[in-house]
């Protein structure tokens, strides 16, 4: 009965002002940097390769992780080849293309997290990010606060910027 629940809400005590900032930030086990930034015995690599290797590492360590977005699937492997070989290694069920629909790409991470996945998504160019900002700002960034810490969205959103070319009329 809606009326009963409404009366319960009206009768509820006022929120405690000292707790208003609880759950603004999701807890993290990472509190400091570890490892060496430039190990002496390693060769330097291109930034695009570093991104590829980082995603590969995440996908190897977390079988529930997925990579999807614009042109990251097997055929192209990313506009800058930043996802090359990932579909071959992890399969088309974990690395796949989506429609060119930035709001969907970013917003779908909420549902993917609810289903137990660890989504990694890519918007093809920073020029295209604007339609997805509403999902990022109103849903993902506030998920820990709005759920009282019960459902912080864990996603990684990759957006290439600063390379040659561009994508949109922005």
Residue ranges and their predicted role:
Residues 21-170:
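Thiamine diphosphate
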Residues 1-19:
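Active-site or pore-adjacent capping/gating segments
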């Amino acid at each position: 009965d809606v009326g009963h629940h409404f009366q319960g809400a009206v009768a509820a005590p006022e929120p405690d002002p000292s707790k208003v900032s609880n759950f603004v930030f999701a807890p993290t086990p990472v509190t400091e940097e570890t490892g060496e930034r430039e190990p002496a015995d390693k060769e330097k690599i291109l930034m695009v390769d570093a991104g590829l290797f980082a995603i590969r590492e995440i996908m190897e360590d977390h079988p529930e992780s997925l990579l999807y977005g614009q042109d990251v699937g097997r055929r192209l492997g990313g506009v800058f080849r930043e996802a090359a070989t990932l579909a071959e290694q992890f399969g088309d069920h974990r690395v796949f293309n989506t429609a060119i629909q930035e709001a969907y790409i970013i917003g779908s991470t909420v549902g993917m997290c609810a289903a137990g996945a660890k989504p990694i998504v890519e918007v093809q160019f920073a020029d295209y990010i604007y339609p997805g900002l509403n999902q990022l700002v109103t849903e993902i960034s506030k998920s820990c606060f709005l759920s009282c810490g019960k459902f912080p969205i864990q996603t990684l959103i990759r957006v290439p910027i600063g390379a040659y070319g561009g994508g949109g009329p922005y």
